Amino acid sequence: MKPERLSHARRKEQTRERLYGAARTMFLEKGFAATSVEDIVEGAGYTRGAFYSNFRSKQDLLAELLRRDADEAQADLRAIFQEEGSPEQATARMIAHFVHAHREHECFPLWVEAYLLARRDSAFHERVHALRHEKLLHVSAHIQTLLTESDNALPLRADALALGFVSLCEGMQLVSLCYPQSATDPLNQIVLAEFASSVLYRQSMEKTPPMQWRECRTVENR
């Protein structure tokens, strides 16, 4: 029996996936600037022609990798709110998610390189800014949902809380990137969990004490 012949669209999709995989590996191992188009196509088993028939440049490919990473993060966050449970349980899961992401976000170095590149490339800056803005809107919407469902008043606007929380997470990730030994430091987890807990539970502390970070980890591991 002859193997099924792939359509042009399917072959193109397969080529893009292999280029994505090779680029992601190379960028994380060598860094974006030190990785050439030749490195990527050699790793994927293609030619430069295959690369440029799918992407305009390395920056274009990097932006697409960041888009995928952002989409995965949003899907993970949505899944938290699809689980059954009280608003307090959803809040605990959200806190645990960010504590976990701080330790396990493998693609964070790509975001750091993208932010630096965006300072010198206005077109690329627009793409990276759009991705981060979308992330902030997504987190803000979930914070608003949590506080609405639990009948708690927001201490700040949801978008301000999202900006503060995401910025704190990115700052802690940057410290972990520069000092890898600190990535597993329990203090880092406590800082993230307690900050989020003090904000998201602020209005209901008298009714229900904020969940401690160890309890958040229990929820995370379920």
List each language-model region with its residue ranges.
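Short loop-to-helix capping motifs
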Residues: 57, 120-122
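Amphipathic alpha-helical packing segments from all-alpha helical-bundle domains
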Residues: 79, 104-112, 122-148, 160, ...
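Hydrophobic alpha-helical connector segments
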Residues: 64, 78-108, 154, 158-165, ...
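Secondary-structure edge/capping motif, primarily at the C-terminal ends of alpha-helices
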Residues: 84, 115-119, 176-180
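Generic hydrophobic, amphipathic alpha-helix propensity
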Residues: 12-23, 40, 65-69, 73, ...
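Solvent-exposed, amphipathic alpha-helical segments
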Residues: 18, 22-29, 76-80, 110, ...
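Helix-turn-helix
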Residues: 18, 22-60, 64
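Hydrophobic/aromatic-rich alpha-helical bundle segments in the mid-to-C-terminal region
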Residues: 124-126, 147-222
